Amino acid sequence: MEGDIVQMGAYIGAGLACTGMGGAAVGVGHVVGNFISGALRNPSAAASQTATMFIGIAFAEALGIFSFLVALLLMFAV
């Protein structure tokens, strides 16, 4: 009985950890949307800012991957 409650808590925690993946998607959308907005205002500067955009996307996606790993650890290690 006690093991079932612990397993249920692990599944609830894994579900809550997955909300970080939604936050990563919002972050990537924000970064790319602002880049496109800036590129439309000043197309000549867009080429020099592309690398910065990809770094921002990588950081936002890293948070999503970390939350996914936490969810996997909660589901299978607890």
From Swiss-Prot:
- List locations, semicolon-separated: Cellular chromatophore membrane
TM helices/strands, residue ranges = 12-32, 54-74
Name this protein carries in UniProt: ATP synthase subunit c
**Cross-referenced HAMAP family:** ATP_synth_c_bact
Q: Give Gene Ontology CC terms.
A: plasma membrane; plasma membrane-derived chromatophore membrane; proton-transporting ATP synthase complex; proton-transporting two-sector ATPase complex, proton-transporting domain
Chief location category: membrane
Q: Which organism encodes this protein? A: Rhodobacter capsulatus
UniProt site positions, description: Reversibly protonated during proton transport: 61
GO MF term set: lipid binding; proton-transporting ATP synthase activity, rotational mechanism
Instruction: Extract the InterPro entries matched here.
Output: ATP_synth_csu_bac/chlpt, ATP_synth_F0_csu, ATP_synth_F0_csu_sf, ATPase_proteolipid_c-like_dom, F/V-ATP_Csub_sf
- Domain of life, per the record? Bacteria
> Known Gene3D superfamilies for this protein?
F1F0 ATP synthase subunit C
